[in-house]
Amino acid sequence: MDYVKNIDLCRCLSLLLVVCTQKVEEFTTPVVGDYKLQCWGAEGKTQSSVKYKYGFPGKGGYSEGILKSIKPATIYISVGQQSSNKTSIAFNNSPNGLTSFAIGCSGGGATNITTTNRGELKNFASYRNEVLIVAGGGGGCEWNGQGGAGGDFVGKDGNSTTARGRKGTGGSKDYGGITGVLPGDTSVNGMFGVGGYGYANNDTCECNDYGAQGGGGWYGGGGASYTGAAGGGSSYIGGVTDGKTIAGDSTNPKQPTPDGKSEQIGQSGNGACVITQLSFN
C-alpha cells in the first residue's frame, strides 16, 4: 500500500493517509476501538492540457464518520483518480464498455471505504449495505465553464458558458445526474458509482465528441456533450456514526486538507483517504 503513516506519541494513536494507487487497498484495524474515516473525492478534468486555460473542473467532495470496531476487521479503500490526461478514464469512475473518451474529458473518481472488496464502487450496486462512506468526485468541463463540484449529499450542477455547450446535473442520494446533450446526441445519465456522459456525432458538431463526464459518487453526476460542463457526484454516509459531508464548492464550512494542517474549498487533483485511530477499548 502507498501511504504515509505517522504516530502521535502523546496520544499513542495512529494516522494513515492513503493516496490514489488506481487499485483497491486494504486496512486492518489493529485493535478494537473507534476510527475516524475521512474521504476526499477527486477533481474532474478539462479539455486543455494547460490547467484552467479554458474552463474549470469541479473539485472533489468530502465525507467523514466514525467506525466503531468491535473486533479487528479489514476494510477496503478505493481512492478516486483525476485522470492522467484529458481522454483517459479515471479510476473509480469508469463507465462499462468505454476505454477512453476520445475527444472529451473525464469526471473525477469517487473515494469510498467498504467492508468487502468488489473493485470499483459501481460494482456495489447490489451490495450497498457493504459501503461505509463515499466522497463524490467533481465533474469534467470540456471548454469554457465550470464543472459541478463533488457534493455533500447532492452533487453540484455543471455550468457551461459556450453557445452550444450543455450542462449535466449533480447526482443525488437516490438518482444519477441528468446528462445535457444537443438534439440527436447520445445521452448516458449518471448512475450508481459512475458519472454519465454525452456523445456528439458528426451531424451535430462535425466531430465525434464525448464532451464532459460527470463525477463519480454514490450516484454519479450527469455528463454534457460537446463543449459542455458536467455535474458532480454525490457523497454518502452509511455504516458509520457522526457522519458529515462537505461539498467541493463549500466556503462555509470548508473541508479539512488531507494532511490536517489547513482548510480548503474542495479537493484538487486525486482524491485521498485518512484513517485515524481515536480510542482503544
PLM region spans:
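Catalytic nucleophile loop of clan PA
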Residues: 90-123, 146-153, 191-237
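Extended extracellular/luminal ectodomain segments enriched in beta-structured repeat modules
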Residues: 29-36, 70-74
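A short beta-strand element within beta-rich, extracytoplasmic domains
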Residues: 34-43, 77
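Acidic, glycine-rich loop-and-strand cores that form catalytic or ligand-binding grooves
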Residues: 130-132, 155-217, 221
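Short, structured beta-strand segments at or near domain termini in extracellular proteins/domains
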Residues: 111, 134, 267-281
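Secretome/extracellular-domain signature
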Residues: 57-166
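A short aromatic-anchored loop/beta-hairpin motif
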Residues: 15-20
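Short, surface-exposed beta-strand/strand-loop-strand elements in extracellular ectodomains
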Residues: 46-58
